UniProtKB/Swiss-Prot annotation:
Chain ranges passing through the membrane: none
Entry's family note: Belongs to the universal ribosomal protein uL14 family.
Pfam families: Ribosomal_L14
Any one GO CC term of the record: cytosolic large ribosomal subunit
Coiled coil spans: none
Organism, scientific name: Spiroplasma citri
Keywords associated with the record: Ribonucleoprotein, Ribosomal protein, RNA-binding, rRNA-binding
Gene Ontology terms describing biological process: translation
Record-given protein name: Large ribosomal subunit protein uL14
Entries under PANTHER family matching the protein: 50S/60S RIBOSOMAL PROTEIN L14/L23, LARGE RIBOSOMAL SUBUNIT PROTEIN UL14M
MF-aspect GO terms: large ribosomal subunit rRNA binding; structural constituent of ribosome
UniProt-listed HAMAP family: Ribosomal_uL14 (MF_01367)
Length: 122
């Protein structure tokens, strides 16, 4: 379960390695988020020469969680790490590549560009 103060890995080439969740968007009393939800994050670890800087506040979409989720057809999908993709205000990704698989729920949430950049959509 992703909540405030959770540290997540970044699954794109924007230059960030790790982010810290500041706020879960989508409700005033919302405590947890899942795959396909948008969160506000701050950058904690970066690679040199990246697009983003340490301490910068950005929006991100959750693409993988350890908790996983159950689908309506009865299947359950679960990943080995919690990961996000950094997005701009127009919901397009900041990076040009995405690493690792993403869940189909990201595409269903309206992030078609992120799904097309991903090497595998589960």
């Amino acid at each position: 379960m992703i909540q405030q103060e959770s540290r997540l890995k970044v699954a794109d080439n924007s230059g960030a390695k790790e982010v810290l969740v500041i706020k879960n968007l989508g409700g005033s009393w919302r405590k947890f988020t899942n795959i396909g939800d948008i969160v506000v994050c701050t950058i904690k670890k970066v690679t040199p020469g990246g697009i983003v800087k340490k301490g910068q506040v950005v929006k991100a979409i959750i693409v993988r969680t350890k908790r996983g989720l159950k689908r309506s057809d009865g299947t359950q999908i679960q990943f080995s790490e919690n990961a996000v993709v950094l997005i701009k205000d127009d919901k397009n990704p900041r990076g040009t590549r995405i690493f690792g698989p993403i869940a189909r729920e990201v595409k269903d949430a309206g992030f078609v560009k992120i799904a097309s950049l991903a090497p595998e959509v589960l």
